[in-house]
Amino acid sequence: MPERKGIYFVSDVHLGLQVGDPAGREARFVAFLRSIPAEGTRALYLLGDIWDFWYEYRDVVPKGYVRVFGALTDLMDAGVKVYFFPGNHDVWAYGYFEELGMKILQQPYVTEIGGKTFCLGHGDGLGPVDRGYRILRGIFHNRFLQACFSTLHPWFAFSLGNGWSRRSRLGKRDRYVFKGAGEPLYKFCASFNDQRTASGEPPVDIFLFGHYHCPVDLPVGPSRLLLLNDWITQSDWLVFDATAGTIDRQVVGWDVPVL
C-alpha cells in the first residue's frame, strides 16, 4: 500500500453562489475530490467558505450537494481524514458534517505535518481588523442570535442569507489585492510568531489560510504565508508532500512549485 504522504488544502469554493457557472463550479470541485489518490493521501483540509451559505436547523440541512458529500464520504471511507474550518459564509454548521465523519477545527489551529509546523484557518477576523467587521463577525457567532435565526422558516432564512451573499464583494466579482505587511492577517502572523518565540516555542513554518480570494506567497520573518485563491473563475488548491517537505499550488490542472 502506498505511503499516505499527501495533504490537500482547499478553500473558498462557494458552492451555491449564483455567480458565473454554479453547476460547473460544483462539478469541478467534485472532479477535484475524485482525483485525490485516497491510498496515498493522509488528510484533506477544507479551510472555510466551501459553501456560499450554509445554515443547519436542528432537523433540516440545506438541499443539494449530494455528489460533493458522496465524494467526501468516499475519501473518508478510504481512510483519508477530512477536516473542516468554518468560514464566514458557512459558520453555521451544527453537527451534520461531523455526522458524515469530518472533524471541525477552529482557527488558528497549529499542527505539525511532516516535520513542519502549520498554522491553519479560514483567515477572517485574524489580526487588527476594523470595528465594523468585528461587530458583524460577533453577530454571526452569537448563540442567541443564531437561535433566533433558527425560528425563521427556511425559505425566508435562505432568502436572507443568499441575498446577503449576492450583495457582498464576492457577489459583485470585485477582486481583492493583498497589501502585504499592511494586512491584518500579515500582522497576525508576525505577532503569532513573536508570542511563540517569547514562550520558548519555535516560529511557525507555514501559515496557510483562505478568505482573501487571491493567491499569496509571502515571507513573514522566518515563516511563509500562503493564501488560497477562490474557485469562482478557476480551481486552486495546495498539496503538501509530508515525506519530501514540499508544497505545490495546483491551478486548473497545472502546478507551480512554491516551496
Set out the residue ranges of the language-model regions.
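Core catalytic region of metal-dependent phosphoesterases/phosphodiesterases
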Residues: 2-6, 10, 15-113
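A structural signal for the main folded, soluble domain(s) of proteins
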Residues: 3-6, 252-259
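Residue-level detector of flexible, active-site-proximal loop/helix-junction positions
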Residues: 14, 89, 111, 127, ...
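Hydrophobic positions within alpha-helical membrane elements
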Residues: 17, 54, 92-93, 127, ...
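A short, polar/proline- and glycine-enriched secondary-structure boundary/capping micro-motif
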Residues: 20, 129-132, 257-259
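N-terminal short leaders/motifs
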Residues: 38-39, 52-75, 168-204
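Conserved beta-sheet core of the metallophosphoesterase superfamily
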Residues: 100-106, 117-119, 124, 128-141, ...
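Active-site-proximal loop/helix segment associated with metal-binding centers of metalloenzymes
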Residues: 123-191
